[in-house]
Regions:
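Conserved C-terminal helix/tail region of periplasmic/extracytoplasmic solute-binding proteins
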Residues: 293-316
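Sec/Tat signal peptide C-region and signal peptidase I cleavage site
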Residues: 19-25
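Bacterial N-terminal signal peptides
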Residues: 8-18
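Periplasmic-binding protein-like
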Residues: 40, 106-116, 197-222, 233, ...
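Secondary-structure end/capping motifs
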Residues: 225-301
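Pocket-lining segment of extracytoplasmic ligand-binding domains
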Residues: 88, 166-257
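Bacterial N-terminal signal peptides that target proteins for export
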Residues: 1-9
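Short, glycine-/small- and polar/acidic-enriched structural segments
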Residues: 27-165, 169-174, 178-186, 201-202, ...
């Protein structure tokens, strides 16, 4: 009988060890970014590096996409749990039938802007009549530009649109176009300034376009009750708050894991993006989303304005 006691103890220890390992094991989540890692993703990187995801039992895999158009589609297909996307894109893709829903906000203001050379001939939007405007993505950017021009008595037919792909700042600097639509105010403006060609920006939200969330977190709409998502948003909020409270330390953490981004452009973009992060990533302004949906319908980008609850939610 006495010789069997150690066996019982060993068995008990093995059981307790197994249970402990299961308790420690992290729930895994895959989040596909909208683009390669950059300062727009700062709260996600900080939440990762400070252990905020780990502290709530999550292992979050942050993946840069091979194709920047693919993240929402991969989520809709069940290939990833979450993706970083854009509010305007969400409305259009839901209208097209993709089963997506917004569960959080990363960047709560527009970053998009209409940019020209500060020392060039464009001083006001009205000066763009008869000029060349570069763009990288059609659809929403065309509609946004049209509204901005109309406010100053110009039709989109009064300008020449040129597809410059993603070479927005270089196209202005080289003189190939007089302005570009779709330039991110935290990047292209800094890129131009660094090479001694400062820009002037016109902001859509000041020129007739309703404000919107530039970057959001989307999930598949039949997965909104996944308990991992609530934990994810809670950890993301901690990442944002740490970033706001400790911007310099956060920058050092960021470049520690992404050494290739330790340059003047990203340092300036970091500074300019911080005030634009959503302090409450999980909060949802339904009226704001409803208003933007109506705007897209007026511009002919969507046919209907479904209830906000169909494509955006505030997790409980």
């Amino acid at each position: 009988m006495l010789t069997r006691i150690p066996i019982y103890f060993i068995t008990l220890i093995l059981i307790l060890t197994t249970l402990t390992q299961r308790a420690i094991a992290k729930d895994e989540l895959t989040l596909i970014l909208d683009w390669f890692v950059n300062p727009d993703h700062a709260p996600l990187i900080i939440a990762q590096e400070k252990g905020f995801f780990s502290n709530v039992g999550l292992k979050v895999n942050l993946i840069a996409p091979a194709d920047p158009n693919s993240p929402p589609k991969l989520v809709a297909a069940g290939k990833a749990e979450l993706a970083v996307s854009y509010q305007p894109q969400l409305h259009v893709q839901v209208a097209e039938g993709l089963p997506l829903i917004r569960i959080g906000t990363l960047v709560a203001t527009p970053l998009n802007s209409l940019v020209a050379l500060k020392d060039g001939p464009i001083k006001t939007i009205a000066d763009l009549k008869g000029k060349k405007i570069g763009f990288s993505v059609g659809g929403f950017e065309d509609a946004m530009l049209s509204v901005m021009l109309n406010k100053h008595g110009i039709s989109i037919k009064d300008v020449e649109l040129i597809n410059v792909n993603f070479a927005l700042a270089p196209s202005i600097i080289s003189g190939n176009v007089h302005a570009v639509i779709g330039a991110f105010r935290n990047f292209e403006l800094n890129q131009m300034d660094i090479v001694g060609k400062p820009g002037i920006a016109f902001y859509p939200e000041e020129e007739g376009v309703p404000p919107y969330d530039e970057l959001i977190i989307v999930a598949k709409n039949d997965k909104v009750k996944d308990p991992r998502f609530v934990k994810f948003i809670e950890a993301l909020e901690k990442g944002v708050l740490f970033l706001i409270n400790h911007p310099d330390e956060s920058w050092r953490l960021f470049i520690k894991v992404h050494k290739n981004l330790d340059d003047e452009l990203n340092k300036r973009a970091w500074r300019d993006t911080i005030p634009r992060f959503a302090l409450r990533p999980g909060a949802l302004d339904r009226k704001r989303y409803r208003r933007f949906s109506k705007f897209l319908k007026t511009q002919g980008l969507i046919k209907n304005t479904p209830p906000v609850s169909d494509y955006a939610i505030e997790l409980q």
